Amino acid sequence: MASVIFHAFHQIAEKGSMKLFRSHRPEYVDGGQMRDFVYVKDVIEVCMFLMHHRKNSGIYNLGSGTARSFLDLANATFNAMGKEPSIEFVDTPADIRDKYQYFTEANMSKLKSIGYDKAFHTLEEGVGDYGTNYLLPGAKCY
């Protein structure tokens, strides 16, 4: 499955705008639904750490440890593309609306307790790196 950023880059490149789900809960603004976005390069770093610290094998939560909104992700994507944000909010499909998670955030305490202390990329850093190096036409890995 392709990342939200991958889809966003392509939507913006093709249409000049992107779509996000409208909120169906009063405590969240449209696009205010939150996820713990983590950059794949950070996941690789953690995997490498765990490979070298085998005595600490087990099941670990993995994320940045900080929930950010889809609106933040959209703005970071537009910024990485050098474009002004243009976001269209659409209804969450009825068949998933009641099950849709509005907030997820990884508890990173177990990983930190075994000595992992490397900083994770911010959302803006991860989106910028991914877009610049992998998604934009002319990127070194395009």
Question: Where are the regions a protein language model picked out?
Answer:
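C-terminal substrate-binding subdomain of Rossmann-fold SDR/epimerase-dehydratase oxidoreductases
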Residues: 12-142
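Flexible, glycine-rich beta-alpha linker
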Residues: 1-6, 28
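Short amphipathic alpha-helices and their capping/turn segments at secondary-structure boundaries
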Residues: 6-12
